Amino acid sequence: MRLFGYARVSTSQQSLDIQIKGLKEAGVKASRIFTDKASGSSTDRKGLDLLRMKVEEGDVTLVKKLDRLGRDTADMIQLTKEFDAQGVAVRFIDDGISTDGEMGKMVVTILSAVAQAERRRILERTNEGRQEAKLKGIRFGRKRIIDRNSVLALHQQGTGATDIARRLSIARSTVYKILEDESRVNLSKI
C-alpha cells in the first residue's frame, strides 16, 4: 500500500501549505503529493489527472478535506467510482471518512451533496451582498490610479477644475487636492 496525497486551492492567491503539511503529517511523501491551483469548477486539474494515472490497486489517496477533491456531488461520485474501480481508497483526513466499504462511499456522497449545497448558499449570499452594495454606490475592484501629470498638464493649459475632473473621470475635489499638493511642493522649493 502506497500513500498519495491531493491538495487543491481555488485561486492562485491561496496557499496550499496547510493542506500539504497535513498530508505530510499523515505520512505522505512529498514526491507523492499532487496539487492544483484552480477552482473546483475548473475541469483543468493537471495535478488530479496525474494522480489518477499514478495510483494503482491497493494504494490510498489522502485529501485534507472533502471539498478539496471534487467540483460538485456528481464529480465526487465519478471520482470515487474511478478510484474504487482501480482499487484505490480515498480518505479525507479532517472529515474522518473514507471510501473503504459501501458505508464510506455513501457518507462521501451525502457529505458531497451537503458541501455543494453550502457552496451554492454562500454564492447566493455573496451575490446578494454585492447587489446590495452596488445599490448603495459601493464600487468593487482596484482603485483607479490617478494620473497627476495629466491633471497638472490640463491645468497649465488653462483648463478649469470641473473640466479636468470631467475629462479624467475623477472627483473635482481630487483635482483640487492635486493642485494644492503641487503648489505646496513649488512653495517649498522657493
UniProtKB/Swiss-Prot annotation:
Entry keyword annotation includes DNA-binding: yes
Active site (UniProt): S10
Pfam family, one: Resolvase
SUPFAM superfamilies, alphabetized: Homeodomain-like, Resolvase-like
Location of the DNA-binding region in this protein: 161-180
Source species, domain of life: Bacteria
Keyword rRNA-binding: no
Single GO BP term: DNA integration
Functional description taken from the UniProt entry: Site-specific recombination protein.
Protein name: R46 site-specific recombinase
Organism per entry: Escherichia coli
Originating gene: tnpR
